[in-house]
Amino acid sequence: MDKIFVDEAVNELQTIQDMLRWSVSRFSAANIWYGHGTDNPWDEAVQLVLPSLYLPLDIPEDMRTARLTSSEKHRIVERVIRRVNERIPVAYLTNKAWFCGHEFYVDERVLVPRSPIGELINNKFAGLISKQPQHILDMCTGSGCIAIACAYAFPEAEVDAVDISPDALAVAEQNIEEHGLIHNVIPIRSDLFRDLPKVQYDLIVTNPPYVDAEDMSDLPNEYRHEPELGLASGTDGLKLTRRILGNAADYLADDGVLICEVGNSMVHLMEQYPDVPFTWLEFDNGGDGVFMLTKEQLLAAREHFAIYKD
């Protein structure tokens, strides 16, 4: 977008609605990739324009006719240009993302929240757990969104938020503090289970890196802005998942459950471990590649993952 084009937008567009319409047009024309919390240009525009004005996403419709100042228009136009030209996800431009109805701070130290596990949390893992969990582990916590959402869903529970990345934990700690949950959610630095005490969890939830080498090489440019540490997991995408499967049983209570997301790498997992009774979960709001195993099932399958035990 050249300077004349930018000046035209700033000079002629006047209202929030104008900026939303213009952003939708720019996104549609640029054929950008949607995959960081939206799947269409309108939602993408809403999540860029309104946070850029420090407004909530659900403003009254009549407020969209409010006129904007020159500095507000410049801010929006600049971010739209960066979204189109640099393919930066909107969440990194606004430092805002949403998960389970809660707002989170994000930047390029963490992945943008988008896991279908959010639907399970909203439903309080109905049909998957036998009792209210008192101790929950969020492994590979990243921004802390899953851990924090679990703390809202189960306010009596203690939630441990584990990650190997100090950068990710810094973001998680910021979100924990902003949500007022410093007594409920405990950030812990650990290489998966390796540095954890032998705590017995009622529920382990994990969205580890699971992108295989082939998919990593073909990712849309938007994903290049995310930390590779949070995406890549070896040739078949299961490098970390195998370690989780080899160790999780030691950290689960007798009636505990493991919920793990592996995305497209579910194909490799099913092919390589046909005797493991993975329960593949279905979602009303889209998404797949999330399985459940009980402690009993993990113990029965332990021989398959013995070499990955810490």
From Swiss-Prot:
Gene Ontology terms: biological process: methylation
Organism whose genome encodes this protein: Shigella dysenteriae serotype 1 (strain Sd197)
Family: Belongs to the protein N5-glutamine methyltransferase family. PrmB subfamily.
Name of the gene this protein is made from: prmB
Name the UniProt record assigns to this protein: Ribosomal protein uL3 glutamine methyltransferase
InterPro entries: DNA_methylase_N6_adenine_CS (IPR002052), HemK-like (IPR004556), Ribosome_uL3_MTase (IPR017127), SAM-dependent_MTases_sf (IPR029063), Small_mtfrase_dom (IPR007848)
Annotated Gene3D superfamilies: DNA helicase RuvA subunit, C-terminal domain, Vaccinia Virus protein VP39
Enzyme Commission code: 2.1.1.298
Entry GO MF terms: nucleic acid binding; protein-glutamine N-methyltransferase activity
Keywords recorded for this protein, A-Z: Methyltransferase, S-adenosyl-L-methionine, Transferase
